[in-house]
C-alpha cells in the first residue's frame, strides 16, 4: 500500500509557477450526444491521470513589499494672542471770562488761587499721563504679565511669564497681519476641502468683534476671508465647480434659563433647534460675489443681541457663529478626487468678565472661574480621544475626569454650543483660538485670569487625521436626470448625438482617473461638460416656465371662449324670438291689407253718441234730409214719365237666379220635417208664406221668357220704396225697446242715433235672428238681396201694387249694390276660412264698438218684433200706415221726446223731420260681408192669418222676395 501511495503521489512542484488567466479548453459534449457510461469495473481498472496539486504554500510564503505608513503628524492646539492698544485721555477746557486789558499787576500765586475759587467752571487743558501697561511682549510666542504697583505693595500677585502661544500680535498690528498669520492656513485647507474653526474670546471691550468683523475702513477676519475666497475661486481652474453658502446664527444664554438659538438670516421668529453638529431649520443663502456676502453679514449684525456694560457701549451678549460652506459640483484637478463639502466656521463669543466690575448681567453661573471662558472647560467635559486625554493628564496635569461643578455648568449653559463644536473639540477637525486682552492696569485681573486658564491648553497636541470621504469618488452619469428634464420636448437627433459623445468622453475620463497617472494638461473636458450641463438646465427651466405661462394663457382663452359661446347662444335665442315676432306681424299686415282690398267701403252702423255732440248729429241729419228730398223728387218725376222708360232700363238676370234659389230652398225646407213648426209658431207662419210664394214662382216660370224680356222691372218694383224714403219705419217701436232693454236704456239717455264708421264686422252676433245662414241654409247672395228690401216691403206692398218706373230704377240700383257686396264677400270667403276671419274680426274691432254694435242689434231686433205686432192688428191700420208713408214724411224726434206709443200725425202741416239713412240696409250689407251666422229667423205672421204646412224655417229675405213676386204676378 505504501508503494502504491508513493506511486500515486504527484511530482514535486517547480520553483516557478505560471498561472494562465483564461486557459484554452474544449467544449463539453451535450448530454444528448454522450455515449453510454462505461461500467464501474472498467473505471476501477483504468489508471488515474497524473494531476499536479496547486502550490498554495509557495504562494503564501512569497513576501510582498508593503509601503511604509506615514507617521502621524502631532500638532498642538493653535492659540493666538492679540493685545489691545492703550487709550489716552485728554480734557479740553474753555474759559468763560477773558482777562481785561488794563489791570494792575498781581501776584501769580494769588491770581491762580483766585481763579480757581471765583470761577470753578474755568478749567484748563490737562493731558493725563499715559496709562501704564500691565502686559509686555517678550517675543512672538511669549508675554510677561506685571501687576500694578497697588497690587505689588499688597503682595497679592507676582510677575508671570506665559509662553507657548502660536503667535502674539502686538498692539500696533493690523487686521491683515492677523489674517496672514492665523486665517490664511485655515483658508488654504478649506479650499482643499478641509473644515476648520476659528474662535475669538476675551473680556468685554478687548476687541473680539473688531477682530472678527472690523469696520468699513479696517475690515476684520470675515470680510477679508470672503474676499480671498472669491479671489481664489476666480483664479483657480475649478472655480466654476465650487459653490458657496453662508449661514449665520446666534446662541443666547439668559440668567437662570437655558439656551436658545436664532437664525440671523431668517425671519422675525426664526428659533432653531441644535442637534449635535447639525441645526434644524438653519437657512443657508448661496453667495455669488463679495457684495452679496457683505450685505448678508450687515443684515445679521443688526439682529444680533447686544447690551451696554461698564466697559463697552455695545457688548455682544450672544455667541455668534458664521458658517461658510463650500460644495464641489465637479472634479478637482488639483486633488484628482471629488472632495466632500468643507465648512469654515468663525465664532465670535460673548464678552466674559467679572460681574462686579463690568456690571454684566448676561452670564452669572455662581461658580468662580467658570463664567468668563467656558470654552476652556469644554474639552475636559467631552469624551476626548485616547491620545488627547493622555496628553492632558500627563503633560498638563488636567484630571482624566472633569470636576462635577464644571461638568454641570458646561452641560447646562453651554450644551448647545458644546454639541455643535464637538468635532472640533475632539480633534477631528482643525481649530484655532485667538485671545484678545487689554493691556491697561485696570484690566489686570481679567487678563491674568484669561492667561492662567488658557496656558495649559497650549501644550495639547493631537493627531491630524484625514477625514474619510463618504462620497463616491466618481460621478455617475446623469442619464436619468436628462430624460426627466426633457419630458416636454421630443429628443432631436443632434441632442442624441451630443449625449452619446458626452457618454464616451465621460467613460474615457473615468478610465483615466482609475489609472496611476492622469494627464494634468487635460482640464478642458470636465469644464466644458459642466458648462453644457448648466446650459441644458437653464434651457430646461426656461422652457418649463414658458410652458406654464402658455398653459395659463390657454386656460384664460378657454374661459373667454366659453363666455363668448354663452353670449352667442343668448343672441341666437333672442334673434329667433324676434324672427317669430316679425313673422306674426307680417301675417297680420297681410291680413289687414287683404281686408282693406276686399272691403273698399267702410260699413255704417248706428251707435249711441253722447248728448254733448248734438251739433254733429244735426249736421248729419240735415244732409240726409237733402238727399231724401232729391230722391223723392226724382221718383215722382219718373212716375209721371210713364212706363216707356221702365221698359228701356236694363235689369240684370240676378232676380231670376234669386227666384230659382229661393224656390229650391223652400222645397228643401218642406222635407226637413214638422218638429221646428211645433216648437216655434212664428216659423210656421213663414212656411205658409213660402208655400204661396213657391206656387207663384212656378206659375211665373210657365209664363215664359216673354214676360221677363218685356217687363222684367215689375218683379222688383216694391224694392225701391224704402230706399227712396230712407226713413227707418222702426221709430214707432222706440218706446217699447227702451222699456224692454234695461242695459240700452242706461246708455240711450241724452243721445241720438247717428251714422258711424266701424272697421270691424265681428260683433254682429246678436243679430243672428235677423239673418242666419247656418240655421236657415240660405246662401249669402240671396240673403243680401232679400235683406235690402225687407223693412220697406211690409208697408209699401199693400198700398201700391203697381210699381212705377222710378221705383223700378231705384230697385235696380239696390240690386246692383247687393251684387257688388256679394262678390266682395265671396272673394273674402275664398281667401280666409271662417275661423281665421272670425279671429281677425275679433282682433280688429275695439271693445267699445263691439258693445255698441250688440246694443244696436238688440234695438233693431226689437224694432222688427214691434212692427210685426203692429202688422197683426188690422188691415185698416196697414192701409193708414201706407197712406201716411206715401203722402207725408215721417218725423223722427229725439229719443228723449218719444212717447210710449208712437202715432202718425194726421194734420196737413209738414212737421220738422230728421232723416237717417236706411240703417237696416246698411247693417245687412255689413253682416253679409262678414258672414255672420244668425239664429233662427224671427217669427212672422201672415196677413191672412193662415199657417203654412212647411216645417223648415225661412229667412226674412226669402219671405220678402216671395211677397214681392206675389204682388207683381197679377199685374
From Swiss-Prot:
One GO biological process term: microtubule-based movement
Ranges for the region named Disordered are 1-44, 93-121, 700-856, 872-917
Detail which positions bind ATP: 202-209
Ranges of compositional bias, category Basic residues: 903-915
Query: What highest taxon heads this organism's lineage?
Result: Eukaryota
Task: List, as start-end ranges, the regions of compositional bias called Low complexity.
Answer: 29-39
Q: Where is the composition biased (Polar residues)?
A: 768-783, 809-827
Question: What are the Basic and acidic residues biased-composition ranges?
Answer: 700-709, 785-797, 831-842
Q: What is this protein called?
A: Kinesin-like protein KIN-6
Organism placement in taxonomy: Eukaryota, Viridiplantae, Streptophyta, Embryophyta, Tracheophyta
Amino acid at each position: 500500500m505504501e508503494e502504491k501511495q508513493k506511486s500515486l503521489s504527484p511530482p514535486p512542484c517547480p520553483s516557478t509557477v505560471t498561472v494562465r488567466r483564461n486557459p484554452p479548453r474544449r467544449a463539453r459534449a451535450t448530454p444528448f450526444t454522450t455515449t453510454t457510461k462505461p461500467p464501474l469495473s472498467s473505471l476501477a481498472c483504468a489508471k488515474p491521470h497524473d494531476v499536479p496539486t496547486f502550490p498554495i504554500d509557495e504562494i503564501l510564503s512569497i513576501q510582498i513589499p508593503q509601503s511604509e505608513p506615514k507617521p502621524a503628524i502631532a500638532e498642538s492646539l493653535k492659540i493666538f494672542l492679540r493685545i489691545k492698544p492703550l487709550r489716552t485721555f485728554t480734557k479740553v477746557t474753555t474759559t468763560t471770562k477773558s482777562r481785561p486789558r488794563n489791570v494792575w499787576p498781581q501776584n501769580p500765586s494769588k491770581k491762580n488761587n483766585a481763579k480757581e475759587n471765583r470761577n470753578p467752571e474755568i478749567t484748563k487743558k490737562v493731558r493725563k499721563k499715559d496709562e501704564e501697561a500691565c502686559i509686555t511682549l517678550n517675543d512672538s510666542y511669549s508675554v510677561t504679565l506685571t501687576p500694578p504697583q497697588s497690587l505689588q505693595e499688597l503682595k497679592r500677585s507676582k510677575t508671570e511669564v506665559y509662553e507657548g502661544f502660536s503667535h502674539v500680535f502686538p498692539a500696533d498690528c493690523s487686521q491683515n497681519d492677523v489674517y496672514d498669520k492665523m486665517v490664511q492656513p485655515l483658508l488654504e485647507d478649506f479650499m482643499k476641502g478641509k473644515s476648520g474653526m476659528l474662535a475669538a474670546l476675551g473680556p468685554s471691550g478687548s476687541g473680539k468683534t473688531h477682530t472678527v468683523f472690523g469696520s468699513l475702513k479696517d475690515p476684520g477676519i470675515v470680510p477679508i476671508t470672503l474676499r480671498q475666497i472669491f479671489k481664489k475661486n476666480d483664479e483657480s481652474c475649478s472655480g466654476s465647480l465650487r459653490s458657496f453658502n453662508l449661514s449665520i446664527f446666534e446662541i443666547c444664554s439668559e440668567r437662570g434659563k437655558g439656551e436658545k438659538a436664532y437664525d440671523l438670516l431668517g425671519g422675525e421668529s426664526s428659533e432653531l433647534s441644535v442637534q449635535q453638529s447639525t441645526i434644524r431649520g438653519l437657512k443657508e443663502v448661496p453667495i455669488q460675489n463679495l457684495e452679496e456676502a457683505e450685505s448678508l453679514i450687515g443684515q445679521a449684525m443688526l439682529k444680533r443681541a447686544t447690551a451696554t456694560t461698564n466697559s463697552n457701549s455695545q457688548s455682544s451678549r450672544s455667541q455668534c457663529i458664521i458658517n461658510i460652506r463650500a460644495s464641489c459640483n465637479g472634479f478637482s484637478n488639483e486633488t484628482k478626487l471629488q472632495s466632500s463639502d468643507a465648512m469654515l466656521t468663525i465664532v465670535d463669543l460673548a464678552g466674559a468678565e467679572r460681574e462686579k466690575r463690568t456690571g454684566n448681567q448676561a452670564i452669572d453661573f455662581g461658580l468662580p472661574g467658570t463664567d468668563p471662558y467656558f470654552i476652556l472647560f469644554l474639552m475636559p467635559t467631552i469624551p476626548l480621544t485616547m491620545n488627547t486625554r493622555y496628553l492632558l493628564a500627563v503633560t498638563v496635569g488636567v484630571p482624566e475626569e472633569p470636576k462635577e461643578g464644571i461638568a454641570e455648568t458646561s452641560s447646562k449653559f453651554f450644551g448647545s454650543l458644546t454639541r455643535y463644536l464637538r468635532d472640533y473639540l475632539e480633534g477631528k477637525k482643525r481649530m484655532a483660538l485667538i485671545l484678545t486682552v487689554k493691556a491697561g492696569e485696570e484690566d489686570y485681573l481679567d487678563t491674568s485670569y484669561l492667561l492662567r486658564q488658557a496656558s495649559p491648553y497650549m501644550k495639547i497636541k493631537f493627531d491630524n487625521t484625514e477625514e474619510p470621504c463618504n462620497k463616491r469618488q466618481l460621478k455617475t452619469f446623469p442619464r436619468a436626470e436628462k430624460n426627466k428634464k426633457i419630458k416636454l420636448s421630443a429628443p432631436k437627433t443632434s441632442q442624441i448625438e451630443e449625449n452619446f459623445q458626452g457618454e464616451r468622453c465621460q467613460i474615457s475620463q473615468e478610465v483615466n482617473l482609475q489609472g496611476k497617472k492622469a494627464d494634468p494638461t487635460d482640464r478642458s473636458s470636465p469644464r466644458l461638460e459642466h458648462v453644457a450641463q448648466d446650459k441644458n438646465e437653464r434651457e430646461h427651466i426656461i422652457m418649463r416656465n414658458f410652458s406654464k405661462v402658455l398653459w395659463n394663457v390657454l386656460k384664460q382663452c378657454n374661459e373667454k371662449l366659453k363666455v363668448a359661446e354663452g353670449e352667442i347662444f343668448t343672441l341666437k335665442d333672442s334673434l329667433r324670438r324676434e324672427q317669430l315676432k316679425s313673422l306674426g306681424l307680417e301675417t297680420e299686415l297681410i291680413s289687414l291689407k287683404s281686408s282693406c282690398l276686399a272691403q273698399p267701403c267702410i260699413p255704417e252702423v248706428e251707435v249711441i253718441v253722447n248728448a254733448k255732440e248734438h251739433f254733429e248729429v244735426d249736421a248729419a241729419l240735415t244732409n240726409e234730409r237733402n238727399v231724401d228730398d232729391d230722391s223723392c223728387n226724382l221718383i215722382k218725376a219718373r212716375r209721371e214719365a210713364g212706363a216707356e222708360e221702365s221698359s228701356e232700363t236694363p235689369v240684370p238676370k240676378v232676380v231670376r237666379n234669386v227666384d230659382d234659389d229661393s224656390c229650391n230652398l223652400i222645397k228643401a225646407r218642406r222635407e226637413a220635417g214638422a218638429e221646428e213648426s211645433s216648437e216655434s209658431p212664428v216659423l210656421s207662419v213663414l212656411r205658409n208664406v213660402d208655400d204661396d210664394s213657391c206656387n207663384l214662382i212656378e206659375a211665373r216660370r210657365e209664363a215664359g221668357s216673354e214676360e221677363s224680356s218685356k217687363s222684367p222691372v215689375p218683379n222688383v218694383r216694391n224694392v225701391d220704396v224704402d230706399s227712396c224714403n230712407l226713413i227707418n219705419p222702426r221709430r214707432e217701436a222706440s218706446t217699447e225697446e227702451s222699456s224692454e232693454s234695461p242695459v240700452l236704456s242706461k246708455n240711450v239717455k241724452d243721445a241720438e242715433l247717428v251714422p258711424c264708421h266701424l272697421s270691424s264686422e265681428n260683433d254682429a252676433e246678436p243679430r243672428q235672428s235677423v239673418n242666419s245662414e247656418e240655421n236657415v241654409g240660405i246662401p249669402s247672395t240671396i240673403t243680401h238681396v232679400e235683406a235690402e228690401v225687407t223693412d220697406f216691403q211690409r208697408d209699401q206692398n199693400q198700398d201700391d201694387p203697381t210699381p212705377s218706373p222710378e221705383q223700378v230704377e231705384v230697385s235696380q240700383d239696390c240690386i246692383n249694390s247687393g251684387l257688388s257686396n256679394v262678390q266682395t264677400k265671396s272673394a273674402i270667403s275664398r281667401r280666409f276660412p271662417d275661423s281665421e276671419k272670425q279671429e281677425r274680426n275679433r282682433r280688429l274691432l275695439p271693445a267699445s264698438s263691439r258693445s255698441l254694435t250688440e246694443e244696436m242689434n238688440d234695438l233693431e231686433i226689437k224694432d222688427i218684433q214691434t212692427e210685426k205686432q203692429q202688422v197683426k192688428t188690422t188691415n185698416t191700420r196697414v192701409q193708414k200706415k201706407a197712406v201716411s208713408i206715401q203722402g207725408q214724411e215721417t218725423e223722427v224726434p229725439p229719443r228723449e221726446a218719444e212717447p210710449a206709443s208712437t202715432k202718425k200725425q194726421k194734420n196737413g202741416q209738414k212737421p220738422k223731420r230728421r232723416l237717417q239713412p236706411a240703417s237696416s240696409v246698411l247693417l245687412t250689407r255689413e253682416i253679409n260681408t262678414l258672414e255672420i251666422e244668425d239664429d233662427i229667423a224671427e217669427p212672422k205672421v201672415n196677413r191672412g192669418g193662415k199657417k203654412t204646412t212647411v216645417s223648415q224655417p225661412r229667412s226674412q229675405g226669402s219671405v220678402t222676395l216671395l211677397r214681392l213676386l206675389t204682388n207683381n204676378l197679377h199685374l
